[in-house]
Amino acid sequence: MSIIKTIKRHLPVARLRRSSQPANGTYDCRALPDSLASVGLSSRAGGILMTFVPPEADFQRVSQAWQRFNSADLTVLTLSSNGALSSSRSQSTYCDGNGPEGSYLWLPDTLIARHETHIVDLHVADTQTASQRITAIQQELARLQVRMPLSADRTFAMIYCDGLSASEGFLMQAWYNSGRFPCLAIGGSAGGKITFDGTWIGTGGRVLQGKAVIVFCQMAPGKSFAPFKSQNFTPRDQSWLIAEADPVARTVTSVFNRQGQQQSFVAALCEHLNCNEAQLSERLKGLTFGVKVGE
């Protein structure tokens, strides 16, 4: 049974139309909604509707279906993902990453009283170094015409990047360098297949690549917000001091060992994992790399 039928059975549309609480749910990319009512929302819904598209789906087709619901009062964001979450699922909050199941989150205007959306070019194709890209993005941010007043207690920014741009860090560096935005920044990146075929963001009826979308949000009177932080990994004892790296390509070539000598990072990993180079990919399964920053 599709999620649309389930919603209709358990939550009559007449009741749904009166709801002003945030809502989330799942949908089937093989049977896309033909109206907001079919996913339990009023045709007059205002606020922000975020939809997450599973990696195996046709993003263009799915995004186009959801973007039909854009209006003067409702902003629809469509994000490619590598797996979605929804608290509406009975078995698990995790949607099947390899199937047709996507999820959505509606933030009504009773919660987010006012919002505005901006698109920022990440200058992936025309910059070669980290400093060039940061400068170019900072110039883009300087040109944004933000109409709403920003404050740390009443507003925040939701920022979503093209995941394959590898520019999240550059964008945030430019964001803080600009000094223009005295508010919390939250968000993430559009995901996709592990084959890195592409990541996409849909907004305003367009499908974007190489861009970031910033949604400035102002809380409704009597509403407040607080950041929630979590990690999906547990740090291990081993760390290395990086000697050579390319921050644009996100690659590490060499590190310093405990004796202060420079060595190939591949050799350092093989030594630590007690394997040869041919076995390294297998030994790295279940592991990832990160940079620890201050809390």
Predicted regions span which residues?
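Small-residue-enriched flexible segments
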Residues: 2-47, 53-59, 65-69, 74, ...
